Amino acid sequence: MRRPPPLGPTTASGPEGNVRNLQKRQAPGPGAAGGCGPEAGGRRENKQKRRMVARATPGRGEVESDKSVAASGAGKAARRRVEGRRGQVSPSDSSDPRGLEAAKEAELPLQTERHTKEKRKVTEASSDDPQPGLDLVRKESLTSSESFQTVECLQSLGKESIIEGIKRRIRNKKLKSLENPPLKITENEATQNIKVEFQDELYKNTPKYSCNILSPEVENNSVLKLRDCNCFPHSKGCNDENNLPYKPDGGCMHVAENFSKKENLRSLAEKSDTNSIPQLLQTEENVMEVNKLLPEESDLYQSKTNGLLSCLQHEKNKYSIEESSVGRKPRKRMKLSEKADETVTEMNFSNEYNKSELMLQENQMIADGKEAETKSPLNVLRKVSHNTVSLMDHLLSVPETVEKETSSEHHVNAVFQKTIEPLLKEETESTSEPLGYESMASKEDFKSMKSFIGKSPNEYHIERRSSREDLRSASEELNLSCQRTIPMTGKRTWPCYSCARISAWCWKKASLPESSYFFPGSQESYRQVDVPKHQTNQTHLTDSKLLLQSSLTETNTESSSKEKLDSNSNCLSSVSAVEPTLMVIKEPIIKDDKKIKSEELSRSGSEVISNTTEDTQLTSETQSLTGNKKKARGNLMKLNLTATSKDGQEANNSAGKTIHRKACIAQQTFIVPDLVKILNTGRLTNFKIPLLKNKTEKRKEVNAKSSEREAYSPLELLDNLSGADIRQNRSKENVSMTMLGPQTLSIRNSVTPVQASSDSFYNKKSYSISPSFTKQGNNSKPSNHVSEPGNIVSNKEVASLTVENNAFSCDPGYVEKSPSFCCNEQETFRPVSSEVRGRKITKNFSEVGFPDILKAYEDDILLIDVIQDDPDLFGVSNEGELSFTSEVPKISQEEPNVAGEHQSTDSKYMETPVKKEPSDDLRELPVLDCGWIKPDICASNSAESEIKHDPKDVNTSLGEVANETSENETLGDFSEQIKGSDLDEKHRFTDKVITKEEKENIYEVCKSKDSRNADIMVGECQFAVPVPKPLCLLVPPLNLSGRQEDTILNTWMNGTICFLNEILLAFGNIETRRFFYQKQKTIKVFQKSLGLMIPYKYCKFHFNTLRGCERPLCKFAHVPEQGDEKVCMDVFKKYININELCLLQRAVNIFMEYYRKFPPGVYFDLQVLNDLLNSLLKHCLLKEVFQIVNLSIMVKMLPSLKILLNIFEYVATMKLRNAVPALIDIFCKLVEAGMVLDPEHFNYIVKLLYQVQASKQEITAVLEMKSRLQMRQFKKNWKCDLHSALNKLEHCKEKGDWTKLGKLYINVKMGCEKFADFQTFCACIAETLTKNYEDERPDIPFCEFAETVSKDPQNSKVDKGVLGRIGISAMCFYHKLLQWSKGRKVLEKLYELKIHFTSLKGLIGPEKLASRCQIVNVAAEIFLKSGSLDGAIWVMRESEWIINTPLWPCDRLDVLNRHNLLCTIAHEILAKSLYRQTFEVLQNLPGFQNSQETVEVSQYSLLFNKLLGSCIESSSLGMSSSVAEFMISKSIPIDFSFLRRLITSLGRSCLWLKARAHYKSALSLGCYPPLEGNLYRKLLLIPSYLSEIEMLLAIEIFMVSNASSIQSPGTSTQILQIVLKRCEDNQSRSSDDYQAAVERLIMAARISDPKLFVKHMTVNVNKEQVYSLEHCSALKWLKENMKWAGKVWLFSNH
């Protein structure tokens, strides 16, 4: 699409030099005519209007056109525009007079304020001096920035009418500013008052904000100085409506034709170095010239035609966003330093083409609408106050919408090469700003800026190939020229495939959430402003640059494709503008239609940054690296890779452009000589870029996934890309030397030139590094990515020191300036050496010939970026697979122009799904990663500090690992050190931190892995396609030991070997093939043996290899058999010596499995056990340590005391509180098993336990073990033996000194070594105490002895037991002697000392075998005989009345003695009217407790009836009732008279419940005549001898029994008769007794409740009174009492 010519007078104000350059570069092509004139601008405006009606683009277009006019000569700009755009019409250029006027009106106040501020800061060079070299320099235009901000602000407000007025004002003001004398661009005092004046008049006539290069804030604050002409920061794409950050490939090398350009560039570089101010003054014309110089690049981006559509849509959105963002709060100024340029790091921003362009536009529209709400960084950046916005800030802050990502910010960052410290400060300050993104000019931003500055587009442009039709059409469009045409409108609109285009990776999915526009890494890192930015700064440097390049490439392709698809160039430009912004995203999903060419290898500094002005939308589209579209397909890669000779080669046949090889290759890459020859041979005429087919569906799935989540796991992305996508294209794809980390493979430094086109999706990722690649990214640790130039050596990344194009883009003298060499650590670059097959390859970077960018400008050379996976350039293997630049065994020194390329694959996300043993990972460098293997880059230090897998950290980058592994590597000093590295200190610190974290993480992961974990998991690897991935690590830069080399390919799957031969065919170098064949052999044949002599019956892989046995079912034994303990010991020793985590874990398994089955034998070596435990502790395998110690205790092979102390120390140091209980348990077991500790050891252990905050119980357990050991130690030191103690005992006996005897007992107790001796001594004491019976003294020897012993402070249960047994012996002795008083004194002493002697036995004599019943009987008898019933009962209670139990058996004599004793006690107690105690004694008579006792309980009837009678007599109704119940329950015969008396007493006492219960029991026992026969005949016979209570109870039973008949309605006439029966013996009784019985009957009826009425009816034949029970009273009683009465009387309780 063509850019519209500048409107109005702006077209005329361009320096002649620029015009001359345009003419020289111009190669008329189809549609080229419209490039420069106003007519073309009109046409473009019309298209823009159709596409951008709602965007208010026209006004902005005019404003930008005004800017561009000032920037470049009219003629030159026109030509450039014509050639660069070739029929591309920038939709944003259309101008609407009304819109301009409205914009002007609205913007006047803002412009006035901004203009004032900017005048203080900016001094514009005289407009007279045309500076063609300004292609590499961006001059910030105050006017354009103001207008740009205003337009953005207005657009965000959605005020189109106002926007138009503001635009008119802006244009007027711009014209005025152009007329103003050259201003001095001075950084704001806020940016540390760095005032910079441009030495030359290079920038006099350039518009203040030319080509939308920088965000308005950037314009205000600083000027971008492009070092080595590599960095052409691109602040904003055409019509940065969405402010999508175009990620300009900071390394794009814009070569000016004129020698004056070279001089200007040098002066700029020098001045910028001295002033540390990147000069932003670069006219759009110059940029377009660079595009011309890089015609080939356009071809690279031709393949991205499809991507252009999305880019254009993004551009539209971006433009609207920019307008809306106008008027925001000015960002803080950022001080720039020359170091910024030097520290520029490549950032290949992973580009992803959103599958659905329409969806993308929708998202953009949504994003635009939400921009004000979300406070997108763009809005913040685009504030009226002219706050400088770093390009990377936009990238970092890429808010949740595509809009938020603005290349302008990124460019600004590139432009503002500010020291990291100021950036950090500013970023922290900016965090307080609305989104925290205002301080976009953070370290990260500057890093990205820096990365932009020094990088050539070739390094960073990652090309995707669109469909062949798109490519062909695009090729035809740019067939004549890829020159960048600068519309007179000032908008930087490049041809779809022009060199200057920036390919933005757009999310094609409209459904992508705003946050989804953050590529997985970028969202996290960008949003995390508060996160330490220095970590991401490095990444940003690389990211910004990579993104820029990738955006350039993709934008070209996408724009070209869109160009064809959509006639409206408006969409194209807008989309392209949007697309570059997306490039910021860390792991963009790359549209499968496009193939990314890993151009980094050949990034010859031809990285062209499209200068996208506000209106020019195509600016962001891409920097086409190729001039001739058709030829450029293959020529770009070829040129980049092979362009090493200074002699110009004709890259574009039609244009007749020559490529300056020296300048072309800025990325110093070590290339195999044969490969270089291949690359150099032939012209690129027949070069064809293979097209990716049928990839849209799969890619869409990937895009959909990426859109669904903010953070994208590289593993997920890799997994999502199935092999189907790759298989279709693998024959046409070259294998990239770098491992592709899906999200953050910052391959800038390690740029591996060739990448499988099938991997294009990943290539972009691999080359695109978002700032979030650092810790802020997905869980990624801060790491100086290989992409960062400084990381090449300073970060010491293992992969290889790949010098970015920019790094060596200029003369070796310029190396220090090149951003790629801005090492974070400011360490001199020492020669990088790597051992390949034992041959050490070393090349000093300073010795490598670097293309001179300035010389390239002087010679007017066109720098081309080469598609590295092009089969035509690099050849195709027999299988049709692309050959890849493999590890170069030697640096091609024959061609000095070719910079040695070290592939430091910064595959941060290349997690190897391989289950590898850590050692394997450490020593194996996967050279090829087949399919989609995602290996953790396992690099190893020369010191063999092995890095373990860190699968849990998806973001672990090779850069991080490399940092760790290469710490010990000795790198040769480079001839020149990097001078201005702002990243030095901070990046150095970051590297260290990263290394530490990586070590920890890797260690944590690996310690849990077994050797079998080294196997690659096919599921994760997803060998979708047998296309070998790029080399994970290149040999040349690595100092690999032989051991490491042997296992370098260990991570390959079997599928990898399949492609090794195919790949090797591409190499003509015999040594190269030999090297890979050697690796192939290593993979196929065997794992390196550990050197153990293993019997044949055992699996040699399990025992004798690092990875172990991988066979699912192994027929060989994995555990030694019995008798082969020597094999175990040998294996343990070997594993301990190797000290590999996996081997140690295997040793644990072997140890556990073997010694669980078999006991230790003669070959068991305790030292091996100790060494194994030490090794496990060093590897933090505490669980395994506990397992082994526990097992060793079981087999009685205790570890050393030192091991135990080490375990305690480890637990205390690591604060492992949860491990303390298990450790205390092990400690106690060890002590009990015989481990001896000194008191100081105990004290130390207790101290450690306090340190770990152990509980009181745990510490007490340790102290108890201490006391036990102390006692043991004391016994060892005891001098007195048993004989001496016995002698003393006899002496005490003679003297009768029982107190001294007690002290002797205490001493013996403390000093006796054996408990048996102690028991013997105690027996002697008992005998001594019981043999003084002849002594008539009243004192009791035992009591004095017991008193002395009990006073011992250390008196324990043991002492009480000994005293109790001695006391029993004494008691029995006195019982035999019938000395009841003395025996009682002994018992009382035992009671006093609370010694439970009833459960003890005597020490001597028969008491030693006496039963418990006997001992109790003796004691009770002593009390009883001594007159103490309480004592006797106490003894019985103390013994729990136990007589004969299984636990305490006794003989019949003991039972009989107990019976007699209890009966005696009962009688004595009952005599004392102690009924309760008596009943207690009687209840425990033999026969009641145990069913085994065969004692007849009926014999106790007398005792119980006596007790019952006594209780009744004493009116103890409660006790009487209890006794009666017990007798009835135990079937003890009861006296009925006592029972009837009890019932009567209970009734009269109103205890009716118990009375009824006993009456019912009495009925059952036969105490009363049966009632059943008469109850149901309505006749009740009551004996006359019953009491009134008994009569009433009988009447109740009678009524309840006839309740049914009484309660029935018809039975009221029935009569209930009661007969007062005379007893048989009544005849002997007087009539008074019978009459008393009648009265009792009447009384019984009255005491009833309710009362009953009894009527006398008659007298029967037997002269017995007959009464009738009144029916009504009976019915009433039943109604009130039937509920309980029925339960009591009708149901039996038995």
Swiss-Prot record:
Keywords: Cytoplasm, Differentiation, Spermatogenesis. Residues 95-116, 903-920 have a biased composition (Basic and acidic residues). Its main location: cytoplasm. It is found in: Cytoplasm, Cytosol. Pfam families: Asp_Glu_race_2. GO terms for biological process: cell differentiation; spermatocyte division. Residues 31-40 have a biased composition (Gly residues). GO terms for cellular component: cytosol. InterPro entries: TOPAZ1, TOPAZ1_dom. Residues 603-627 have a biased composition (Polar residues). Residues 1-135, 322-341, 600-629, 891-920 are annotated as: Disordered. Important for normal spermatogenesis and male fertility. Specifically required for progression to the post-meiotic stages of spermatocyte development. Seems to be necessary for normal expression levels of a number of testis-expressed gene transcripts, although its role in this process is unclear. This is Protein TOPAZ1. It comes from Gorilla gorilla gorilla (Western lowland gorilla).
